[in-house]
């Protein structure tokens, strides 16, 4: 799968990539977790998922409702009974270089309010490449074994797990309830012996030890599992009736005392330097190990700190998997293409002589932006020793977690004599409009707006995407077809299709892939989407910098479309209350706010939106409600120094109780929680009559929740 460069990725291209990534990762998840027959390598899966996350971080408003970053594993197979995990079996965030590890440590320190000199210990352990398994013991007896599944619901493989020698049936001196979690794997020697037996029997060979282990554990006949040489490493736990220890290391040692195999390469480390040193030691031993590993896992050692750090939607904040590096390859740069995205960004893509990198044939790679091609970074500093990139060059291609292959270097010794410097286009290759680069922006953008066919089509594709209007039967291919034929040029046209072509349905049903039934189904599907929540409408508009999360926040803030539209028009005056009110929304900064009022302030854009809304029944946004919470649906601002929790912890706690945390005080603020040094926010709250609490008052308000 080929992708455009990330740094120069347009919103149009980003949305298209996210759609492709969602489909690919969904198929890969099912193949890997449910069918035990991977269709891509683990490294490629990590790379695709990281690429997906990178696009979402750059274009948060493009995040899909079914985003792969919010998913763990795959749905359990119908062949096994289901097990609901009392504590979810989550995945791990990934680190791919030393900078990622340092960032991980700094994020933890910031969240906990720890200075750089305060002690912070971690454990490091090899990341076993196998199948995750949860074992439940009650009164020392194994009563249930379940795969991870989708993280919330797994498969009951109890009888199969009983056949694995490393999994004890009975344990002593353990908590009354104990869930042991770890990895089922197969050693290299056992894998080779198993495949030899398979070959002798004329049976299908396994591709690798991980596939063999997963396929063996998930047999419907436990006798087959028993015939396979499976092993188990314990490294974590789920539900406990009593703690195993105060630290990760103590708990692992306790699991070992119960008779479980734990990895002898697990070490305690202090700080990123020791973590990286241990990473290098494990990497050096990787080739000599008799089992597969694909990285090193770092975890905060102190379990109280783990609890304070908590979890994101699919990963713990207190752990990360440091993956082993990707591969490099050299090949010829045969051309440079320019792709135009939904927001007009011009993205250069290297067309390469196909080369295998990390087990995947690569023919396209990112060139980021015009500065990168010229040998500079976004700040104008020299990179690659100032070497520019030219068509005909022999270039180094790098694949890592960013999924999109990158052109990393140039071999000047092999540069053709007739190679000329690349001149980045000053006009859009799709519509011919000027392509301008604003100060501080790394990307050159087409100024054509909706007259640019590339932008118009990508905006329409975004409009019908799953996280937006999600109209059955109207996907990217149909949008391209209808736009080309002049049937749809703006979103409102979608909702007048029946009026314009319903009586002449023959025009649609005679097309390839269409019949009378499918045509009528499309019209019905469009009508079904006339009623739409405000948040989805805002997201569907495809406003630059406004993703799903921001759309939800904005919708909750203004409640109705009329209020939103009027406020955005009023916010054109940046000295007025409407502008300040927009900025008071947590997560809405100056750049995003400017983008919103620009989109709503242009006469042509607003007219197009009004034509759309005239076809719809836009549902008001409802405030978040949390039963029993005195702050549900309230707006809270934190200021000053908090002594009993960090700002990040306070924000996370408030949001978990249904509150909306804003960054500034306004007339819509319900509570100001002020510590020492509150300053201007406390003064403004007093002027507006906003209820002000100190930290103890806030904790008393939410006590017991």
Curated annotation (Swiss-Prot):
What are the BRCT domain coordinates in residue numbering?
626-705
Enzyme category, top tier = ligase
| Record-level GO BP terms | DNA repair; DNA replication
Q: Known catalysed reaction(s)? A: NAD(+) + (deoxyribonucleotide)n-3'-hydroxyl + 5'-phospho-(deoxyribonucleotide)m = (deoxyribonucleotide)n+m + AMP + beta-nicotinamide D-nucleotide
Entry keywords, A to Z: DNA damage, DNA repair, DNA replication, Ligase, Magnesium, Manganese, Metal-binding, NAD, Zinc
Its Gene Ontology cellular component terms are: cytosol
Q: Which residues of the sequence carry a binding annotation for Zn(2+)?
A: 428, 431, 446, 452
- Is Zinc one of the keywords? yes
Q: Which GO terms describe its molecular function?
A: DNA ligase (NAD+) activity; metal ion binding
Amino-acid biosynthesis found in the keyword field = no
EC number, as in UniProt? 6.5.1.2
Q: Which InterPro entries match?
A: BRCT_dom, BRCT_dom_sf, DisA/LigA_HHH, DNA_ligase, DNA_ligase_AS, DNA_ligase_CS, DNAligase_adenylation, DNAligase_N
Task: State its role.
Answer: DNA ligase that catalyzes the formation of phosphodiester linkages between 5'-phosphoryl and 3'-hydroxyl groups in double-stranded DNA using NAD as a coenzyme and as the energy source for the reaction. It is essential for DNA replication and repair of damaged DNA.
Return the HAMAP family for the record. DNA_ligase_A
Q: Which family does it belong to?
A: Belongs to the NAD-dependent DNA ligase family. LigA subfamily.
Question: What is the name of this protein?
Answer: DNA ligase
**Record organism:** Roseobacter denitrificans (strain ATCC 33942 / OCh 114) (Erythrobacter sp. (strain OCh 114))
What is the name of the gene encoding this protein? ligA
């Amino acid at each position: 799968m080929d992708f455009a460069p990330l740094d120069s990725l347009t919103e149009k291209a980003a949305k298209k990539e996210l759609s492709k990534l969602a489909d690919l990762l969904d198929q890969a998840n099912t193949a890997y977790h449910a069918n035990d027959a991977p269709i891509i390598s683990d490294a490629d899966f990590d790379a695709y998922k990281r690429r997906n996350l990178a696009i979402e971080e750059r274009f948060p408003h493009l995040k899909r409702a079914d985003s792969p970053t919010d998913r763990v594993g795959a749905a359990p197979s119908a062949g096994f009974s289901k097990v609901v995990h009392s504590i979810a079996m989550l995945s791990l965030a990934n680190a791919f270089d030393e900078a990622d590890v340092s960032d991980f440590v700094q994020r933890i320190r910031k969240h906990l309010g720890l200075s750089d000199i305060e002690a912070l210990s971690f454990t490091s352990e090899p990341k076993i490449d196998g199948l995750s398994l949860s074992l439940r013991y009650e009164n020392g007896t194994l009563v249930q074994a379940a795969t991870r599944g989708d993280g919330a619901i797994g498969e009951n493989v109890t009888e199969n797990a009983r056949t694995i020698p490393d999994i004890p049936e009975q344990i002593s001196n353990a908590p009354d309830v104990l869930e042991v979690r770890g990895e089922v794997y197969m050693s290299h020697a056992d894998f080779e012996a198993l495949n030899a037996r398979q070959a002798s029997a004329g049976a299908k060979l396994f591709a690798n030890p991980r596939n063999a282990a997963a396929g063996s554990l998930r047999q419907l006949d436990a006798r087959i599992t028993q015939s396979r040489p499976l092993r188990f490493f314990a490294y974590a736990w789920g539900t406990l009736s009593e703690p195993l220890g105060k630290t990760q290391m103590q708990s692992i040692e306790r699991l070992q005392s119960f008779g479980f195999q734990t990895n002898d390469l697990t070490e305690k480390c202090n700080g990123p330097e020791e973590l990286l040193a241990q990473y290098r030691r494990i990497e050096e031993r990787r080739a000599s190990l008799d089992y597969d590993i694909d990285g090193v896992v770092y975890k905060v050692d102190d379990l109280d700190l783990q609890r304070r750090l908590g979890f994101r939607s699919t990963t713990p904040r207190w752990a990360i998997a440091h993956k082993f590096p990707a591969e490099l390859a050299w090949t010829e740069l045969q051309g440079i293409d320019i792709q135009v995205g939904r927001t007009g960004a011009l993205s250069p893509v290297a067309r390469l002589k196909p080369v295998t990198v990390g087990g995947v044939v690569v023919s396209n790679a990112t060139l980021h932006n015009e500065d990168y091609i010229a040998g500079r970074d976004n700040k104008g500093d020299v990179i690659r020793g100032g070497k520019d990139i030219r068509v005909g060059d022999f270039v180094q291609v790098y694949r890592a977690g960013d999924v999109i292959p990158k052109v990393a270097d140039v071999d000047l010794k092999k540069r053709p004599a007739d190679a000329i410097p690349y001149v980045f286009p000053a006009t859009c290759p799709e519509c011919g409009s000027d392509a301008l680069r604003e100060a501080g922006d790394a990307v050159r953008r087409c100024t054509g707006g909706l007259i640019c066919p590339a932008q118009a089509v990508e905006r329409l594709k975004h409009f019908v995407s799953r996280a937006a209007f999600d109209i059955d039967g109207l996907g990217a291919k149909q949008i391209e077809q209808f736009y080309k034929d002049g049937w749809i040029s703006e979103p409102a046209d979608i909702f007048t299709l029946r009026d314009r072509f319903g009586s002449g349905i023959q025009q649609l049903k005679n097309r390839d892939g269409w019949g009378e039934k499918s045509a009528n189904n499309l019209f019905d599907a469009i009508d079904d989407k006339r009623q739409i929540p405000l948040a989805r409408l805002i997201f569907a508009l495809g406003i630059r910098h406004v993703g799903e999360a921001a759309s939800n926040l904005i919708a909750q803030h203004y409640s109705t479309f009329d209020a939103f539209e009027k406020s955005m028009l009023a916010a054109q005056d940046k000295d007025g209350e409407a502008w300040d009110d927009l900025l008071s929304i947590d997560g809405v900064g100056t750049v995003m706010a400017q983008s919103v009022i620009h989109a709503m302030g242009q006469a042509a854009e607003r007219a197009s939106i009004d034509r759309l809304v005239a076809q719809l029944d836009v549902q008001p946004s409802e405030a978040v409600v949390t039963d029993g919470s005195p702050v549900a649906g309230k707006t809270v601002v934190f200021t000053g120094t908090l002594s009993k929790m960090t700002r990040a912890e306070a924000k996370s706690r408030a949001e978990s109780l249904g509150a909306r945390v804003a960054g500034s005080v306004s007339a819509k603020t319900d509570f100001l929680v002020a510590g020492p040094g509150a300053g201007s926010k406390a003064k403004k709250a007093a002027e507006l009559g906003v209820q002000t609490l100190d930290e103890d008052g806030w904790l008393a308000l939410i006590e017991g929740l």
